[in-house]
Amino acid sequence: MAGGATPGRAVVLETGRLLLRPWRVAEAVVQRELWTERDPRVPPHRRIDADGHPTVADLEESIRANRPSSIGLLAVERKAARDVIGYCGLIDSGRGPEGEPEMAFELLRRVWRQGYATEASLAVLDWARSSGYERLWATVWEWNTDSRRVLAKVGFDEAERKEVDAVYGTTLFTARRL
C-alpha cells in the first residue's frame, strides 16, 4: 500500500509518557540543539556549518513552511515535563521502495537511555500499521550502536544493503514488516 496518509491532516500520537505532534515555531531552539549535539562522524550537511547554519531563525522558518501532514518528523514531548526532547516519525527520503517510508528518530543527549526513543518508535509503528503500511525501513550509521539497539528492540532487522562512505562510515539499512 502507498500508506494511509491523509493529505493535510496532522498526526498526533500519545503514549504513557509522550506526546508526538507537529512542531511549534518556538521549538526551533530544540531542533538547533539537536544539530549542535550531532556526532562529528555525521556528514557536514547534517551538522552546523562554518557560518552557523542552520540558525534558530532558519529552523523557525522551516517549521512555518512545513504544513502539518500525515507523514513527517513529529516533535516528541514529555507529557509530565511538557518539554520537547527530539523527534520521531516517518519520512519519504527517496532511498526506499515506493510506499515504504523511512522511520527516523533523534533525541537530545540528556534524555538518552530512558526508553523514550523506543516508546516513540513503537507509537509510530502502531500508527503506521493502522494506516495501512506493510513495511517500514530505517537507516543507521554502523557506529551508532545506541540507535541500532533501539531499532532492534522495536523489531527492525538489518538488511544486506549497505552504503559505504570512506570518510563517514557505513550506513546500514534495516526493515520491519508490519
Regions found by a protein language model. Give the residues of each.
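Conserved GNAT acetyl-CoA-binding A-motif
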Residues: 131-139
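Conserved active-site tyrosine of GNAT-family acetyltransferases
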Residues: 151
